[in-house]
């Protein structure tokens, strides 16, 4: 079976590697253009492009696939490459470009998407972050037959995984990437013998995982500790849950909900205790959060005890207050 692969980040690279290991022929890879990255802001190829080049696969990096859009020459060149590949199917995983109808219609078996949620819950760009942020007990991967809508196509395969209280977006991402890679191989093997049975998504339970905005990273200490703790986990590794002390920026990478209730006369964001277990901070609804791993601007992630050696804090200080 000939497979065009469209994807960009590490999540997609894992799937591409699994397809190649399973023996599928991949004549063409579509991925986002190289972007500036790192401290030197040098152009960097996506993980999927790096993988494709290592395996000697042709790569196309159009700015758009819309023939009537802003970059018609890019789209026309991509169309020629896609048609020349004579693929049976296109596999899409976190590609980052909208696929026009002509793309969906070109492969014999259409386009299959690896989506990191249990559809129809968390359609959209950030399903892993939003599942953790919402406190979901489970998530998973759905292999979907793509249509013109936003993650609205028929479901082909689905598998669940539990979200543990310790999961961050980073750990859950890696687990779902492996799951997605395994499921897409199973889906294509089933498709080769006509064994896939499309199931329409239910009309109930639709939610949208909107793209993460960096502005969301600011911790609102008026929220209950449980809500803040979920956001800390959801925003690891990006954008990181952030607060301030005066003019100094601080990121919180790990925390624990303290079962002890706090005095209600303490201001939300006020540091109530500092000990070997971390920094106790007053939160909304009379709750208490213990910060255990922190980072100051330009620094490294550090356990609270090490962080405090270079950034002294004291009970009574208020995090997130205007300088």
UniProtKB/Swiss-Prot annotation:
SUPFAM superfamilies: FMT C-terminal domain-like, Formyltransferase. It comes from Acidovorax sp. (strain JS42). It holds the Pfam family Formyl_trans_N. This is Methionyl-tRNA formyltransferase. NCBIfam families: fmt (TIGR00460). GO terms for molecular function: methionyl-tRNA formyltransferase activity. One of its GO terms (cellular component) is cytosol. It catalyses: L-methionyl-tRNA(fMet) + (6R)-10-formyltetrahydrofolate = N-formyl-L-methionyl-tRNA(fMet) + (6S)-5,6,7,8-tetrahydrofolate + H(+). Keywords: Protein biosynthesis, Transferase. Belongs to the Fmt family. The keyword Repeat does not apply. (6S)-5,6,7,8-tetrahydrofolate binds at residues 117-120. Its EC number is 2.1.2.9. Attaches a formyl group to the free amino group of methionyl-tRNA(fMet). The formyl group appears to play a dual role in the initiator identity of N-formylmethionyl-tRNA by promoting its recognition by IF2 and preventing the misappropriation of this tRNA by the elongation apparatus. InterPro entries: Fmt (IPR005794), Formyl_trans_C (IPR005793), Formyl_trans_C_sf (IPR037022), Formyl_transf_N (IPR002376), Formyl_transf_N_sf (IPR036477), Formyl_transferase-like_C_sf (IPR011034), GART_AS (IPR001555), Met-tRNA-FMT_C (IPR044135).
